Curated annotation (Swiss-Prot):
The keyword Flavoprotein does not apply. One of its GO terms (biological process) is myelination. The keyword Membrane applies. It is a multi-pass membrane protein. Residues 408-444 are annotated as: Disordered. This is Endoplasmic reticulum membrane adapter protein XK. Changing residue 347 to S: Loss of Kell-XK complex. Residues 1-2, 59-68, 162-171, 230-235, 299-317, 371-444 are cytoplasmic. It is linked to McLeod syndrome: A multisystem disorder characterized by the absence of red blood cell Kx antigen, weak expression of Kell red blood cell antigens, acanthocytosis, and compensated hemolysis. Most carriers of this McLeod blood group phenotype have acanthocytosis and elevated serum creatine kinase levels and are prone to develop a severe neurologic disorder resembling Huntington disease. Its main location: endoplasmic reticulum.
């Protein structure tokens, strides 16, 4: 039985960020900054409440008679109680022999084109730990993108405008960044386990390191770009946020309406149609919050029973990063054109170059992960390197086809004039290189 390290990490980030936010809000209050205090408390307490509801929903405690658990969640102590319960189950699992076990069947990763199916016994204690890990993974994602991401953006904006970074603010920003990166990492692992549910997935430590670096560069550069743009064009940032929000929020619903599928009723038996709609809207809101800052890795599909698309769409991944890179470049260009005196001692071209290189570095680590460290890379129909080679061949073929077109047209015109001037009996033999078709160029 695995040690519940993910549960411990989730609880640590939850407690550390909440404590740092409450301490910083008291500092803002003593300094007379009421607006910063209110926003700091909002981005701290709102995800706390959502985390409590998530844990209650996953464990189905709302329909069970557990008043103490409900009271602890109302006091915002639910994650601490759940963590204590997890470690009690873990340390007591080896002492008691379980009378009932369930059998799960998983397929191993293919070796030499063959994949074996293995059976594994899962006891009640291990099943409870799996449920707890799943609940805390979802809670970490909610805390990261509905609380930590806005909190990090807010505190960095305050630091830029005040031109001062205090110890409490830097501590909160560091914890918030770690929380966002951890939440994005859980999104990647969750996407892999959902898409390859039939297989036994084992993620290596180097894969975790690669995902951590990928997400760190991606999220850090995105937050800095948004803060820089907000500091000079406060009105237009609302337009950017609304465009991003409605684009990602409406996209799954548009696909659902176009598919003509019936409204999903099998999310939770105890939920009514109104409750199901609220849950779907909340999931869409979370999906939107993730994509505002980074690639979600999990594609929401409302017409699917699992609500998650199990197909890996490389096209969506490519389009997302192309559009996001162009958007970041445009926002940085606008910041460079309209920057104020607070950036007097900042080398603006160097900062723009560093941010663009940082985002490209994130894309590089993403490609390295999918090429070398993805646990299910053997199941891919094509790898990243093969796709890049095909794209390079097509690009070279297009360039070679375009270059001979101009001289061919001129030489054909000259040869036709020569035919008109010379007698019909005399014929000129064309050079073989002048009339190569597209297939010969491609084979060459």
């Amino acid at each position: 039985m695995k040690f519940p390290a993910s549960v411990l990490a989730s609880v640590f980030l939850f407690v550390a960020e909440t404590t740092a936010a409450l301490s910083l809000s008291s500092t803002y209050r003593s300094g007379g900054d009421r607006m910063w205090q209110a926003l700091t408390l909002l981005f701290s307490l709102l995800p706390c409440a959502l985390v409590q509801l998530t844990l209650l929903f996953v464990h189905r405690d709302l329909s069970r008679d557990r008043p103490l658990v409900l009271l602890l969640h109302l006091l915002q102590l639910g994650p601490l109680f759940r963590c204590f319960e997890v470690f009690c189950i873990y340390f007591q699992s080896g002492n008691n022999e379980e009378p009932y076990v369930s059998i799960t069947k998983k397929r191993q990763m293919p070796k030499n084109g063959l994949s074996e199916e293995i059976e594994k016994e899962v006891g009640q204690a291990e099943g409870k730990l799996i449920t707890h890990r799943s609940a805390f993974s979802r809670a970490s994602v909610i805390q990261a993108f509905l609380g930590s991401a806005p909190q990090l953006t807010l505190q960095l904006y305050i630091s830029v405008m005040q031109q001062d970074v205090t110890v409490g603010r830097s501590l909160l920003m560091t914890i918030s960044l770690l929380s966002i990166v951890y939440g994005a990492l859980r999104c990647n692992i969750l996407a892999i386990k959902i898409k390859y549910d039939e297989y036994e997935v084992k993620v290596k430590p180097l894969a975790y390191v690669c995902i951590f670096l990928w997400r760190s560069f991606e999220i850090a550069t995105r937050v800095v770009v948004l803060v820089l743009f907000t500091s000079v064009l406060k009105t237009w940032v609302v337009v950017i946020i609304l465009i991003n929000f409605f684009s990602f929020f409406l996209y799954p619903w548009i696909l659902f309406w176009c598919s003509g599928s019936p409204f999903p009723e099998n999310i939770e038996k105890a939920l009514s149609r109104v409750g199901t709609t609220i849950v779907l809207c909340f999931l869409t809101l979370l999906y939107t919050g993730i994509n505002m800052f980074c690639w979600s890795a999990v594609q929401l599909k409302i017409d699917s029973p699992d609500l998650i698309s199990k197909s890996h769409n490389w096209y969506q991944l490519l389009v997302y990063y192309m559009i996001r890179f162009i958007e970041n470049a445009i926002l940085l260009l606008l910041w460079y054109l309209f920057k104020t005196d607070i950036y007097m001692y900042v080398c603006a071209p160097l900062l723009v170059l560093q941010l663009l290189i940082g985002y490209c570095t994130a894309i590089l680590f993403m490609l390295v992960f999918y090429q070398f460290f993805h646990p299910c890379k053997k199941l891919f129909s094509s790898s990243v390197s093969e796709g890049f080679q095909r794209w390079l061949r097509c690009f070279c073929w297009a360039c070679r086809q375009q270059k001979p077109c101009e001289p061919i047209g001129k030489e054909d015109l000259q040869s036709s004039r020569d035919r008109d001037e010379t007698p019909s009996s005399s014929k000129t033999s064309p050079e073989p290189g002048q009339f190569l078709n597209a297939e010969d160029l491609c084979s060459a």
